[in-house]
Amino acid sequence: MSRAGEAVGLLEVYGLVTAFAAADAACKAANVTIESFDKNKPANAESLEIPLLVLVKLRGSIADIKAAMEAGEKAATAMGGVLSRHIIARPEADTEKMLKISAFA
């Protein structure tokens, strides 16, 4: 089932285990699906306690995304931490294309 056009939640966290914990908490808290994960090793990775950033991309209604992001952020904060978060209520067509990209694929 395609959820294109629905709201998107973006939660960037430190570490893969933190990303899985955040995604799990988000999916349990609301009717959302995981669009994809993406990863990034920052230029200053050697100076970071956790040298990997993971972006969790979630899909659902705006109300569900808000609830899911809150739960995911809470779970991630208790572990490796959250770098940034953002909600896109109605993604534009070109943004939709970018949401499909994943470094894990």
Task: Give the predicted meaning of each segment.
Residues M1-L53, K57-A105:
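Long, contiguous binding/interaction regions
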